[in-house]
């Protein structure tokens, strides 16, 4: 009887593991080619995960809190170049490739311009391995890299000829237990 009670108590305390889906375009994108959030959103829904990445609870919480603290902006250009789509439970957003501008999905499905903290943008790009798909000469142009530095685990993904370069990546970010 005692064992049954323990099993029941443990099952009542089980909780859903926190996770984020991060989908991004690999490498540099031509500035004249605009990718809208709705496009990233629809592609993300059709492909499988490439990897599951585990991060420590502190980094995960910083990312989660930063996503919740996104600030709407009024004067933002209509054309944008989103390179990353993030699903954090009930919140979806797209992130610009060169700075901290983002677009948050509203109830009607429209994306509205916002700003995410530099730290959160940096953590999203770093922990999802987005930076690994940028050559060093492009990496150093990133606003967050200039502020926080190149991540200690940065490894530029070199593609050998004639292998086709990876175009997109979808990762699941989870808390390391």
Predicted feature descriptions by range:
Residues 1-5:
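Sec-dependent signal peptide recognition
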Residues 9-11:
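C-terminal motif of bacterial Sec signal peptides marking the signal peptidase cleavage site
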Residues 13-177:
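Function-determining sites in protein domains
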């Amino acid at each position: 009887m005692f064992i049954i009670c323990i099993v029941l108590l443990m099952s009542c305390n089980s909780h859903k593991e926190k996770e984020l889906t991060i989908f991004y375009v690999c490498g540099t994108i031509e500035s004249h080619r605009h990718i809208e959030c709705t496009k990233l959103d629809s592609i993300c829904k059709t492909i499988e995960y490439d990897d599951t990445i585990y991060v420590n609870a502190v980094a995960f919480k910083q990312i989660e809190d930063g996503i919740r603290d996104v600030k709407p902006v009024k004067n933002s250009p209509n054309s944008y170049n989103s390179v990353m789509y993030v699903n954090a439970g009930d919140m979806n957003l797209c992130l610009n490739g060169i700075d901290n501008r983002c677009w948050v999905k509203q109830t009607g499905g429209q994306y509205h311009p916002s700003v995410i903290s530099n730290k959160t943008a940096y953590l999203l790009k770093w922990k999802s391995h987005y930076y690994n798909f940028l050559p060093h000469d492009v990496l150093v142009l990133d606003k967050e890299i200039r502020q926080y530095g190149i991540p200690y685990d940065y490894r530029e993904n070199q593609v050998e000829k004639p292998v086709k370069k990876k175009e997109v990546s979808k990762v699941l970010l989870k808390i390391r237990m």
